[in-house]
A protein has these predicted regions:
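Amphipathic alpha-helical hairpins
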Residues: 1-156
Length: 156
């Protein structure tokens, strides 16, 4: 049984929610880049911040194409807010704490993208969101690997 394509206002709400999610990630990774000492991880954080900025632009373009007003701020969602507040709190700590907070933020981003992909979106939007989701999922996995590599006992 095929579900009906999501209503335009639902699609716009989903896209704007993902814009907020990406803005949160962009800022979180930028903050981490400024504070992390480990060169490889610093570069990774910068790359992820840039990826999220690119995703914001892509999603905003889709919102405009649908006749909507793209979100211009970060998230008010409590889940994402807590994840990135944890990053802020960790900024006074070592690299492992900071990258662990990034991983928490990535957990939230992966979850938001999965929710979006559960909707019956138009094919062109689904393609954009799936590509971004795959990049975010890979970043999440890499973030976890980096966190584990910084753990002296390498606990999972």
């Amino acid at each position: 049984m095929n579900k009906a394509v999501a209503k335009p206002d639902e699609v716009l709400s989903t896209l704007n929610g993902l814009i907020e999610t990406c803005r949160d990630g962009q800022k979180g990774f930028a903050d981490a880049h400024e504070k992390i000492q480990h060169a490889e991880i610093r570069e990774f954080c910068l790359e992820q911040s840039r990826n999220r900025a690119r995703f914001v632009g892509e999603l905003q373009q889709e919102v405009q194409h649908l006749g909507g007003d793209p979100e211009n701020t970060g998230s008010a969602s409590a889940v994402l807010h807590r994840a990135w507040i944890n990053l802020k709190s960790a900024l006074g700590a070592g690299d492992r704490s900071i990258i662990a907070a990034c991983e928490n933020g990535e957990d939230s981003a992966v979850s938001e993208y999965r929710k979006a992909l559960e909707q019956n979106l138009p094919a062109n939007l689904r393609s954009v969101i799936e590509q971004q989701y795959l990049t975010i999922q890979q970043a999440h996995d890499r973030t976890k690997q980096m966190r584990d590599s910084l753990d002296p006992e390498n606990r999972l």
